[in-house]
Structure formats: C-alpha cells, structure tokens
Swiss-Prot record:
NCBIfam families: DNA_YbaB_EbfC (TIGR00103)
Keyword annotations of the record: Cytoplasm, DNA-binding
Subcellular location: Cytoplasm, Nucleoid
Functional summary from the UniProt entry: Binds to DNA and alters its conformation. May be involved in regulation of gene expression, nucleoid organization and DNA protection.
Protein name listed in UniProt: Nucleoid-associated protein P9301_00191
Family in the record: Belongs to the YbaB/EbfC family.
InterPro entries with a match to the protein in the record: YbaB-like_sf, YbaB/EbfC
Length: 116
C-alpha cells in the first residue's frame, strides 16, 4: 500500500524505465534529424534549398538560367524555397516527436501530444 498519495514502487519503476527509453529514443531521433536533408523549392523550381531536420541550412541551388532574373524575383524565390523547406522540416520534426511521445501522455510544455 502506497502512503501519502505516492505511486507504488512498481509504478515508479515503470515510470523510470519509460523515461530512460524516451531519453534513448530522443537521442536517436536527434541524430536522425541532424542527418536529414529536407528540400524546399520556389514555385517555379528555379531555387532549391536544403535544411536539416533541425532547421539548419545545408545548401542552396540556383538554376543557371535564373541568374539573369531581376534582383527582386531572385530574392522572392529564395524566400519561397526557404519557407517551404522550413515548413517541411518542422512538420517532420513534430511528427517524429509525436511518434516518440504520442502514447505516453507526457504533457510537455509547448508540445501538444494530440496535435497531428
């Protein structure tokens, strides 16, 4: 019988096991995200950018025939590609985090486990 409203020893042991597994899985996920290359393209595909699953910029590609476009068009396309890559990267990260924590009801601050 657990006293003072504390969980019994078996529940506590199980909670520690889950926490340790989450920690190991989180490290693995962090490594996976770091090694991902997520591509974003401008609408006309003249600019492509790649960022990691951790939203770090990796590389940029500009179609050679696009280099003669006006400055504003180039800037607009770069921004489009960056936004798309960032959106894909953050979506991927959220999905992977949900896979990691979804069934555990952790109620992490700033993270909705029911958000899909």
């Amino acid at each position: 019988m657990a006293g003072f409203g504390l969980p019994n020893f078996g529940q506590l042991t199980e909670a520690f096991k889950k926490a340790k597994q989450i920690q190991q899985d989180a490290q693995k996920l962090q490594d996976e995200l770091e090694n991902m290359e997520i591509e974003g393209k401008s609408d006309d595909e003249m600019i492509k950018v790649w960022i990691s699953g951790n939203q770090l910029p990796l590389k940029v590609e500009v179609q050679e025939n696009f280099l003669n476009a006006d400055k504003e068009k180039i800037e607009q396309n770069i921004l489009q590609a960056i936004k798309k890559a960032h959106e894909l990267s953050t979506t991927t990260m959220k999905e992977r985090m949900n896979d990691l924590t979804g069934g555990l009801n952790l109620n992490l601050p700033g993270f909705d486990n029911n958000d899909s």
